[in-house]
Amino acid sequence: CELFLRNLCIPADRLIGRPGDGFRIAMETLDGGRLGIAAQAVGIADAAFDEARARLKERRQFGRALEHFQGLRWKAADMWAKVEAARQLTLHAARLRDGGERFRAEASAAKLVASEAAVWCASEAVQICGGSGYLQGAVAERLYRDAKITQIYEGTSEVQRMIIASGVLG
């Protein structure tokens, strides 16, 4: 949605940037915000992995720790891989920004991948923790709620896909 303000008088000391640059400035501000959300989502995903790993090590079934069950080991491997992929993509976008390079598509990709990883890892943590992970106040339950918002604010995952497509396809 575009907004046009015609014949609007703004005192010179109240302008941010030059006339006509407002939309660009707003979008660049969002790029930085998206990078922050990506970092937040990486932290949530990492915490969800830690919560699941602790549960896998402490909980026992059939005389052995859950960490020894192949299917649960695969879940842990997938969680770790998603966390690390999100972390590396976020760091890459941050390096571009710090170097003064364009990073719009990379920031959106980092936010998309990290927020999707956070929700997935938090969901897996709830599943691994079982009924106790679903209880209100449980760490896994809180992480799941915290993860979900990262898919929404600073632009939904669908918006991030549109930005990425514009960046890579034109």
What does each model-identified segment do?
Residues 2-8, 12, 21, 27-170:
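Alpha-helical interface subdomain recognition
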Residues 18:
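Carboxylate- and glycine-rich phosphate/diphosphate-binding segment that chelates Mg2+/Mn2+
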